[in-house]
Amino acid sequence: MSKILVGTSGFGYDDWRGVFYPEKLKKGEMLRYYASRFSTVEINTTFYGIPAPKTFVKMAETTPPWFDFAVKANKELTHNPEVDPGVFASFTEALKPLLEAGKLACVLAQYPWSFRKNEENVGRLRQLRERFGDLPVVVELRNAEWVGEETFDLLKDCRLAFCCVDEPRFKGLMPRVAIVTAPPGYVRFHGRNAKKWWQHEESWERYDYLYTPEELSEWIPRVGEISAAAEKTYLFFNNHYKGQAAQNAVMFADMLGLPTESKETFISEQGQGSLFGMND
């Protein structure tokens, strides 16, 4: 069985104050606090803009030696048929500090639902591997057309890891499958807010969801299958609104019997107790 690491998709959310972070914690102290509770994080801000390398230098220095980062590829690399070589060069240059520090878990390439299964897009996936060389790359395919042995064989051939997901069960969305096509094992929990998935005014509404223990228990055997086939397995919660991702990450780690900080990580608005009712 592989090493299983649980974390969240992003960490710098202001609405986590008073739930996960202390109310008055400064923005610049959030990563250090987060890294005292979790051993991995998924960086999503890189999807929208490419940071200067010094940003990751600071992140690497702020976190413990065992902490690592999954970094989402910039959208220009996944959402445009023609990739600008300059954008790719800037993105890989930004990653160098994490690579040199031994803290880059993988690159997450998230494709849109409109990325359909066809010959052209199969070629784009092959080009993705060629561009990233030997770097570990996880691919999140959001259209259910891709589910099947043909795709899994393609990803294995390209040494691209398949991103398993948990999300609402709508036609055309990815089903809940457990598969490893290349290292690492990888699962993203987006929440099951079916009401707001397609119809929402703000993007965060889609991810306003708190998993129940019963819902997470469905993934225990799946995580077992994934971890049996990969040396490392990453489980990231993307239901970030109001700290629900962090709450579920601790909850699921506890259910899996993984070492975590205590449930006291979660504080009430009064600064006492926890959302898990430790003082009840």
Predicted feature residues:
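Residues lining hydrophobic/aromatic ligand-binding pockets adjacent to catalytic sites
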Residues: 1-280
